[in-house]
Amino acid sequence: MNKRSFKLKIACVFLIVAMAGCTKLHEQVIDEVLGSSSASPQNALAAAYGQMDNGTFVNHAQAFALQEYSTNEAILPTRGSDWGDGGIYRAIHEFTWDGTNSMITNTWNSLNLGITESLTAINSVTQSNDPNKAQLLAEAKALLDLYTFHALDLFGQAPYRDPSTANAPLQVRKAATAIDSLITDVESLIPNLANIGQNNTGNGRFTKQAAYALLADMYLNRAVFKDRYASTFNFTEAAVDGNGTDMDKVITYTSQLIGSGQFKLESNFFHNFDIANANGTELIFVITQYVNTLTNSSNNFAYMPMERNQKPSPANRGTNASCITPEFYHTWDNNHNDPRFQRHYQYADGTWFMNDGTDVSVPVTTAVIGGTTLPWFHFNRGMQVGQQYGPSLSGSSDYQRTPDGRIKVNMLYCEKAPTQLMDFTPALNFDDPTQGVFTQLEINQGVRPFKFEFDPTGLNSRSNSAIPMYRLGGMYCMRAEAYLRKGQTTQALADVNALRTSRTREALYANAPGTALISIDMPTLYNETGYEMYWEMYRRKASIRFGTFEAAGTTKPVSQPFRRIYPIPQSTMDASKLFAQNDGY
């Protein structure tokens, strides 16, 4: 059974349930009373997994927004008549958010639903006689720890109810103390988790390898969790079990993955984010996605930065929303030959899409979209900067063609400002530098990261691309940071250079590998983690650890440490006396 088989099996269950008159298995499971044994263990576990792609980690306006738009990497400005929405997007980057921001509320609710569904799965599996009970129970508990970790990271606290006790009271876990309990729990689950690829598992299931990655993440951020508002963090504190320090544990767990032989760095960096990436050699734990099932999926990470007149097929377009900041773009200065910066697409007949004004046409390839065969235009990947080129529509179902039937490449203009060239400028020039608001004639601004491949079969909104939660490149970043915090500069440099030199450019540039560094320090490592992990919900935690989170930037003033976590939503505070509001809110 392949890596996605478990979720595919559950997708079939979804279909059967739908045909019987219930639209989603989620609805059935959510309605189960905690403590009931009526939910089948596999269905309950599927619901816990399913909450990951029910917006939580795949919608740009939930965890992604809080982890990315709050940093010096990404921004979603108001673009003329679009993306105002009461200022909810700008507030995250301008650090003016409060407990009424709907993205904060939705993220909190989604994580809490993940916690609830994990607790339901734990209870269901515990009461079952499933022959694979030990493994399923370990997976359910691991998902509970994963959702709780993210809630503690973003909000500093998380709800909990003991699933082993009938009518157990609702409790509140606090980050400073709960992080150690989470670490201990995940470590205790490892014996009962399957090795990846065994017992019908793959990278879409929580395996021993996913546990090692989560533990490395927990230990790397443990010092922050324990003293959130500190001016400096104690990264050398003794580990939970007393064996070594936090950074020693990061090295241990990442090394188990790096040295296992089960994973391999992709020479083409962007393969990690392709539509057909499910069997990627680098992927440790992913959110599996399908277009053609009743499970959820999202194309957001590709759709949001693409302009509305960039059309991967005549039936698709981008939405001209998010972009990277000038600060992040300029970290790439003198590093544009890095294979992770940009990659040109080559068509089967050898045509390269240069996107520089020299293109005349590209050959026609096809993608099946909505039961029809439509031409598919492949945009380049990575950072898209400067004047953009691509196809224009001829009618509603085809591109403009050259006399020999190829797709004509044109200079592009912004859809909602037809006289404005689609020039993705590195600079973001706002009339009021404290507010990210563009006029209608300024909506072109901002370099766009095309890290994830746009899936034209999903009609803009859905995708078959698996979303990496943990991958091997991230493990190298974590281990390099742990080495450097221990003063082991040689080892840190070796890990950074392993990432740099394993990635290669396209054949247009003779498949040249990235160049190695000759030295490393903390600012350099911070930039290197950005090159590797941009657009992957990594930046906020890294910025806090590296001490850059409070710095002023584009539309952002110098901020106070209380902004390192978000407020408990006002709707929750109004409805319950259980939670105490976080400091500063």
Enumerate the language-model features and the residues they cover.
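Long, intrinsically disordered, low-complexity segments
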Residues: 19-25, 111-112, 181, 273-333, ...
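Membrane-proximal, proline-rich intrinsically disordered regions
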Residues: 22-70, 97, 569-585
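Short, surface-exposed recognition loops and adjoining beta-strand edges that mediate ligand/DNA contacts
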Residues: 35-39, 59-77, 194-210, 224-331, ...
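Conserved, well-structured interaction surfaces
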Residues: 37, 42-56, 80-155, 167-180, ...
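Short coil/turn linking the two alpha-helices of tandem helical-hairpin repeats
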Residues: 129, 150-154, 159, 221-230, ...
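Flexible, polar/acidic helix-loop-strand segments at domain edges
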Residues: 334-471
